[in-house]
Regions:
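Ligand-binding loop in jelly-roll beta-barrel domains
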Residues: 96-121
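Short histidine-centered beta-strand/loop micro-motifs
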Residues: 56-61, 78, 85, 103-105
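Short loop/turn positions at the edges of beta-strands in beta-sheet-rich folds
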Residues: 52, 70, 80, 96, ...
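Conserved short histidine dyad/triad with adjacent acidic residue
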Residues: 44-61, 96
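Short, conserved beta-strand element in jelly-roll/cupin
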Residues: 49-50, 61-76, 115
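A short, N-terminal "cap"/entry segment at the start of jelly-roll beta-barrel domains
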Residues: 2-47, 57, 85, 122-135
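Short acidic-glycine-tyrosine-enriched beta hairpin
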Residues: 80-97
Length: 135
């Protein structure tokens, strides 16, 4: 719990700092070429722990979503396709308005980080066991 609180405090400070900065191109010893800090007001994110077999309902994101397996093993599915699995460090981008679900594999938990690029999330029906296990 202390780790989560520390991450939220540090993360909140970084987000606040990024919002406070005005985009300005310039020279920076950490970059080569012109690099500009951009506004991130529409970007949101989250971190979730899924127990083995846990998953989201079907849903879509108006402007897409990036999901990342921080630890454990992740399973994802898109409407009309079989599932895919990713080890820790793996990620998947889901384009705008593509119906999908994601969560842990049947035998392994998952810590997932997700990033949305603005817009609404449209929640649909629960992902059935048959859909979750469809190859």
């Amino acid at each position: 719990m202390r780790i989560i609180v520390a991450v939220l405090i540090v993360g909140g400070g970084l987000v606040t700092m990024s919002f406070a900065q005005t985009p300005q191109p310039g020279s920076d010893p950490n970059f080569t070429g012109v690099v500009t800090v951009m506004d991130a007001k529409d970007i949101t994110g989250g971190r979730r722990n899924f127990e083995a077999g846990a998953r989201t309902a079907w849903h879509s994101h108006e402007n897409g979503q990036l999901i990342y397996a921080q630890s454990g093993r992740m399973r994802t599915g898109r409407r009309g396709q079989g599932f895919k699995e990713y080890d820790a460090g793996g990620s998947e981008y889901t384009p705008p308005n593509v119906e999908h679900w994601h969560g842990a594999t049947p035998k392994e938990p998952l810590v997932q980080v997700n990033i949305q690029f603005g817009g609404a999330t449209k929640w649909l029906t629960k992902t059935t066991d048959e859909e979750y296990n469809k190859r």
